[in-house]
Amino acid sequence: HLQRRRQRQMCIRDRISIKSGNNILKNIDTKLFNPYSVIIEKNNWRVTDEGKEYAINENDFSFKIGKNKIQFHVVFNIIHGTPGEDGLIQKYFDRINIPYTGPNSNNARITFNKNECIVFAKNLGISCAKSIFISNNQDVDFNIFSAMQFPLFVKTNNSGSSFGVTKVKNKEQLKTNIENLIGLGNGVLVEETLNGVEVSVGLMEYKGEIKVFGITEIITENDFFDYEAKYLGKSNEITPAKIPNNISDNVKRCAKLIYENLRLSGFARIDFIIVNDIPFFLELNSIPGMSNESIFPKQVRLSNLKLKDLVSYMINNALNN
């Protein structure tokens, strides 16, 4: 059952990557660039162009149309999850010397590791939920959870976008879910539930400063803002969030602090929950959803900037650095 659920979630994530990619493709300025859509599946890397498909040569990330070899100068990375957000595709492009948008391999790896991200945020003085990390080779003594209050969240440690997240209400559910998840990734994270106002912040480095596009309040139909709420429309989103200015300023400050200190590049989305006026860090997406219905593009539409200009800036930034 767990494996089927993971496969279903991964299929949804793949579909979202394609929707995000199509929206980015639409917003690439063809007066400046000659773009192609590349789909990367496990054993099938291919270019799709005008209804035709061309195999990618993985040795140098080129492809052929007839006898004409086409070599990419830059990659706009819009793969959600692995290998786009965990540093793997970045390592590959580093090896073959093709520049790419978004964070480098090491920074992407940190953003995809929930526990490392939480430790990082705490070290910056940002509040986080009480949590316990369990490594794959650890013998779990369930007494370590006695100081934590149910309900708890059990999460695979290396996953984005609320994949592999379950809310548990008692010790039996906790034990079952930890046993199900251990070994599927690089550990399991158990967190206390926070009750408050959940918000999402879209931001990027733009022309020498970290630009925050807006704060969106998320009201989910589900028990929490899980992958269905994020990707299947089971949530209401209010942009800009109806929160007081002083709290809004603090959320922006925390988001900028994380972005800057992680040395991120390009689009990012950082989620917080506001409890008693204090923002608690939840998670970070270094490659946020970019379909037309996604939070980030909606925030951009309410700013004085155009997505096309931001995309051009990111491509030029990758080429020039």
Stretches with model-predicted labels:
Residues G81, S162, I218-E221, N285-K298:
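Glycine-rich phosphate/pyrophosphate-binding beta-alpha loops
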Residues E217-A268, I295-N321:
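Active-site "cap" helix and flanking loop/linker of ATP-utilizing ligase/carboxylase catalytic domains
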Residues K169-R253, I273-I274, I278-F280:
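Phosphate-binding site of ATP-dependent enzymes
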Residues E192, V201-L203, Y259-N292, V300:
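Conserved metal-phosphate-binding beta-hairpin within the catalytic cores
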Residues R5-R6, K19, I65, K69, ...:
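Active-site nucleotide/adenylate-binding loops and adjacent lid/helix of ATP-dependent enzymes
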Residues H1-R8, I12:
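Single conserved hydrophobic/aromatic residue that forms the stacking wall/gate
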